[in-house]
């Protein structure tokens, strides 16, 4: 099977699982915004925001090492899984130790043990599901994802609509669904069988920790870029403002979801390709069409966002639509940064990954600290946008030191300017549809050749 077909096949498999999963999550937002106040929704999201940070710290990001070393072929995969589970046990102990300290944060003190159980279950989830990829069980991976989300949605309906449990119901839904799917993946994914024949290798343990440990700072930096603004909005503005900001961030998540579907397949493909060949044309083509897709999707979503949000969210969250356009542009540059992050992973340049993300995180913290006290939610939006732009451009430049990925700079910059101006105009409610039409026409004219190639390839694929 050619590498393009293999990449497409893996992407489609992950798409089945991810689209089903994310569609359910997307449809749950109206439920949350109608059965929870903006303050409750903000509190719940704050807990999950902190959980993301703790997962990276307590796990030493070992789940990334599981897939990297499991796919490399130089190690026995069951031994790789054993290292993952050893780290998981340590994370349980360390997590229980620091949870009372985390509970000193007043907003989440009531929910600290809910946070703990969600974090440890999420670490196990990431280890198990990455290992399913190592085993080539991508179909099971997709099916289990859909099942977990379906259970989460069902629990949410029960706890929020029938029991009116608010934040408690929201947290219980995620904890119970993650716990059940962890057990299912362990049994039906036959991970128990893999562990039964595993042997501890000290050298492998050290190598995996050496690979994953620098990723802690990288992931923490990503957390700062992606989520620290939520904590700062809660502290500097209000929990209700955080709820509105969270609702606004759900729409850009659609682009992030689509990219993550591709990214899961791309991570596997680039690791395999980097160890056998280093043809820049392949990487350049993939990047070109990834940017074409994400920027095009951004234009479409920004155009319809005002009308869509009117029907999508509860009335208490009505102002959220204004923040979405610039967050959508942020999602485009996040996709660019993630693409180059995969190249770092394949090249085992985790230190570069860490430092480029750390730079953007520092930029984000400074801008948030300066702007949020005066501009509220807008300060967080601007900080997020600038941080993603910084990390995207820095990585594009840095990766060229190790491999050549051809990028048409004129086209890339032109499209970037178009989507940025379009987003600003829509956020300001300035001649939305006239500006949108001009932006789309400019986008099509710039990408006419590449769009034509895509149409021809798609037509051939359909006619087969």
Regions found by a protein language model. Give the residues of each.
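N-terminal membrane topogenesis motif
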Residues: 1-24, 67, 75, 139, ...
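Interhelical loop/hinge segments that connect adjacent transmembrane helices in multipass membrane
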Residues: 1-3, 113, 139, 163, ...
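Signature of the first transmembrane helix
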Residues: 3-63, 92-96, 118, 149-153, ...
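Transmembrane helical elements of multi-pass membrane transporters/channels
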Residues: 10-25, 148, 170-185, 189, ...
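Alpha-helical transmembrane segments of multi-pass membrane transport and lipid-handling proteins
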Residues: 19, 56-59, 82-109, 113-114, ...
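Helix-loop junctions and terminal segments of transmembrane helices
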Residues: 58-74, 248, 252-288, 341-346
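Hydrophobic alpha-helical transmembrane segments
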Residues: 144-191, 358-363, 377-398, 438-443
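Membrane-proximal transmembrane or re-entrant/amphipathic helices at the cytosolic face
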Residues: 405, 424-464
């Amino acid at each position: 099977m050619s590498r393009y077909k293999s990449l497409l096949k893996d992407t489609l498999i992950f798409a089945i699982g991810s689209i089903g999963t994310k569609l359910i999550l997307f449809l749950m937002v109206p439920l949350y915004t109608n059965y929870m106040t903006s303050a409750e929704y903000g509190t719940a999201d704050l807990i999950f925001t902190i959980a993301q940070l703790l997962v990276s710290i307590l796990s030493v990001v070992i789940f990334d090492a599981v897939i990297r070393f499991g796919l490399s072929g130089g190690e026995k995969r069951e031994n790789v899984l054993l290292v993952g589970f050893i780290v998981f046990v340590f994370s349980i102990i360390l997590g229980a130790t620091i949870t009372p300290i985390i509970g000193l944060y007043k907003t989440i003190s009531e929910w600290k043990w809910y946070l703990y159980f969600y974090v440890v279950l999420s670490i196990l989830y990431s280890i198990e599901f990455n290992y399913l990829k190592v085993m080539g069980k991508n179909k099971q991976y997709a099916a289990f994802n859909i099942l977990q989300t379906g259970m989460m949605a069902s629990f949410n309906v029960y706890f929020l609509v029938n029991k009116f449990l608010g934040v408690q119901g929201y947290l219980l839904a995620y904890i119970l669904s993650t716990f059940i799917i962890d057990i299912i993946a362990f049994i039906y994914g036959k991970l128990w069988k893999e562990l039964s024949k595993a042997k501890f290798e000290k050298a492998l343990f050290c190598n995996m920790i050496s690979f994953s440990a620098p990723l802690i700072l990288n992931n923490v930096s990503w957390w700062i870029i992606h989520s620290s603004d939520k904590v700062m909005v809660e502290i500097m503005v209000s929990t209700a403002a955080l709820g509105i900001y969270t609702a606004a961030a759900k729409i850009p998540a659609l682009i992030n979801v689509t990219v993550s579907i591709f990214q899961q397949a791309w991570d596997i493909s680039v690791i395999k390709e980097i160890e056998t060949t280093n043809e820049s044309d392949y990487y350049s083509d993939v990047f070109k069409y990834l940017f074409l897709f994400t920027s095009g999707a951004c234009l479409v979503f920004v155009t319809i966002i005002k009308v869509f949000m009117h029907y999508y969210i509860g009335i208490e969250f009505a102002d959220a639509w204004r923040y979405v356009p610039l967050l959508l542009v942020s999602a485009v540059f996040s996709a660019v940064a993630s693409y180059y992050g995969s190249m770092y992973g394949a090249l085992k340049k985790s230190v570069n990954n860490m430092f480029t993300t750390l730079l953007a995180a520092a930029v984000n913290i400074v801008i948030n600290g300066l702007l949020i006290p005066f501009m509220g939610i807008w300060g967080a939006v601007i900080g997020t946008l600038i941080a993603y732009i910084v990390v995207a451009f820095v990585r594009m430049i840095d990766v060229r030191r190790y491999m050549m990925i051809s990028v048409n700079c004129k086209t890339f910059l032109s499209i970037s300017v178009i989507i940025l101006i379009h987003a600003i105009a829509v956020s300001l409610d300035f001649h939305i549809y006239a500006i949108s039409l001009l932006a789309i026409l400019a986008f099509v004219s710039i990408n006419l050749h590449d769009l034509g190639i895509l149409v021809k390839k798609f037509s051939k694929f359909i006619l087969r």
